[in-house]
Amino acid sequence: MSPQTETKASVGFKAGVKEYKLTYYTPDYETKDTDILAAFRVTPQPGVPPEEAG
């Protein structure tokens, strides 16, 4: 019989959905010479917040 191991679900990641606006902005990001700036015009569908439409 093989020994049992204990697995902890909280190690590595937490399950669930994070609000999008909490994850898309990184205020301390430093630009690099290889970064590319792109702009897109997005029109949200009715009922979708503009910041989540992109």
Curated annotation (Swiss-Prot):
One of its GO terms (molecular function) is ribulose-bisphosphate carboxylase activity. It holds the Pfam family RuBisCO_large_N. Keywords: Acetylation, Calvin cycle, Carbon dioxide fixation, Chloroplast, Lyase, Methylation, Monooxygenase, Oxidoreductase, Photorespiration, Photosynthesis, Plastid. It catalyses: 2 (2R)-3-phosphoglycerate + 2 H(+) = D-ribulose 1,5-bisphosphate + CO2 + H2O; D-ribulose 1,5-bisphosphate + O2 = 2-phosphoglycolate + (2R)-3-phosphoglycerate + 2 H(+). The keyword Oxidoreductase applies. InterPro entries: RuBisCO, RuBisCO_lsu_fd_N, RuBisCO_lsu_N_sf. RuBisCO catalyzes two reactions: the carboxylation of D-ribulose 1,5-bisphosphate, the primary event in carbon dioxide fixation, as well as the oxidative fragmentation of the pentose substrate in the photorespiration process. Both reactions occur simultaneously and in competition at the same active site. This is Ribulose bisphosphate carboxylase large chain. It comes from Geum borisii (Avens).
